[in-house]
UniProtKB/Swiss-Prot annotation:
Protein name: Integration host factor subunit alpha
Gene: ihfA
Gene3D superfamilies named among the record's database cross-references: IHF-like DNA-binding proteins (4.10.520.10)
Keyword flag Ribosomal protein: no
Organism name: Enterobacter sp. (strain 638)
GO annotations of cellular component type: cytosol
Length: 99
């Protein structure tokens, strides 16, 4: 099971008493701010959760799996996530729920 933005909005509606519209907007604004910061080359640090970073990857040789032909994989920028120690500890000590 995956946590969705709709489920996050529903949680805010239930726990904080926000209207469904406001809860949805809050979730959207939160993620938009993370996107904006990353687009501007900024690191995103969420205390107790983890960091989103940008990493530049160089061009490298690759291979088309169907034809075996050598093809270059272009240089690109990727987003990476490094979980914080608190998140790591909680995940390591958690007991997963059966679906």
């Amino acid at each position: 099971m995956a946590l969705t933005k709709a489920e996050m909005s529903e949680y805010l509606f239930d726990k904080l008493g926000l209207s469904k519209r406001d809860a949805k907007e809050l979730v959207e604004l939160f993620f938009e701010e993370i996107r904006r910061a990353l687009e501007n080359g900024e690191q995103v640090k969420l205390s107790g959760f983890g960091n989103f970073d940008l990493r530049d990857k160089n061009q490298r040789p690759g291979r088309n799996p169907k034809t075996g032909e050598d093809i270059p994989i272009t240089a690109r920028r990727v987003v990476t996530f490094r979980p914080g120690q608190k998140l790591k500890s909680r995940v390591e000590n958690a007991t997963p729920k059966a679906e």
